[in-house]
């Protein structure tokens, strides 16, 4: 997604911390899984050092200790973290506790999937990618704390399933429906242009099957904002159900 291993480490750490924040928990420790492309020993060591330095910057800011992990050489650069956290059992935020009358709040603009697909094709503007990268580098920690203070009952993070997929994960167990104003969705700069040009990530077509769950989907499908609701996200935002008087 990004060529800079230091930034890649930061983005990956944010992405992995989101699962903890989405449950209302406080991260404690992390284990790394790293694969660095084959190369000269000095190059491999430098890439690994930059990856972990970026990740450690994010983890340290989250008061999370990197306690170990596993590294290897492989065909391509990969990085992931298993993050452990703590929470009071009575305060867990799950996906199945939406309540009628609540408002859904999303903490980040969407569009990383289509924007970086466009960047790979040489069809994205530099300031679009810079804006998207800054979004991915932004932690959801403060937003998660805000949700807890204002009575959120249900929460999820937006990743590969896109907004529609993750919202459906919240709606179906709760047996609730949602009135969604697409004009209120925050969008990353350039996302409507790239999705409107038909540039999508590899996961987008899989996500489109959930369109049948949306009323009047066929009539609105040509709107690029509708297409962006199926766009998979990396280090995306949180979506939480909050009482209307707290929203």
What are these regions (language model features)?
Residues 1-247:
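Helix-biased detector of long, well-ordered alpha-helical tracts
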């Amino acid at each position: 997604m990004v060529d800079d291993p230091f930034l890649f480490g930061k983005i990956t750490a944010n992405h992995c911390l989101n699962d903890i924040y989405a449950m209302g928990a406080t991260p404690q420790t992390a284990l790394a899984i790293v694969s660095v492309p084959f190369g000269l020993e000095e190059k491999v060591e430098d890439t690994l050092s930059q990856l972990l330095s970026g990740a450690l910057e994010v983890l340290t800011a989250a008061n999370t200790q990197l306690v170990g992990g596993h590294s290897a050489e492989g065909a391509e650069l990969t990085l992931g973290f298993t993050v452990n956290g703590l929470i009071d059992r009575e305060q867990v935020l799950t996906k199945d506790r939406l309540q009628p009358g609540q408002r859904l709040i999303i903490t980040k603009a969407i569009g990383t999937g289509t924007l970086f697909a466009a960047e790979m094709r040489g069809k994205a503007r530099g300031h679009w990618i810079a804006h998207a990268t800054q979004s991915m580098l932004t932690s959801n920690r403060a937003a998660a704390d805000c949700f807890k203070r204002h009575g959120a009952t249900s929460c999820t993070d937006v990743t590969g399933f896109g907004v529609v997929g993750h919202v459906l994960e919240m709606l179906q167990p709760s047996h609730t429906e949602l009135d969604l104003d697409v004009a209120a969705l925050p969008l990353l700069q350039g996302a409507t242009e790239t999705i409107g040009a038909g540039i999508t990530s590899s996961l987008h077509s899989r996500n489109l099957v959930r369109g049948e769950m949306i009323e009047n989907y066929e009539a609105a499908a040509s709107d690029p904002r509708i297409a962006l609701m199926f766009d998979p996200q990396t280090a995306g935002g949180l979506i939480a159900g909050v009482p209307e008087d707290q929203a």
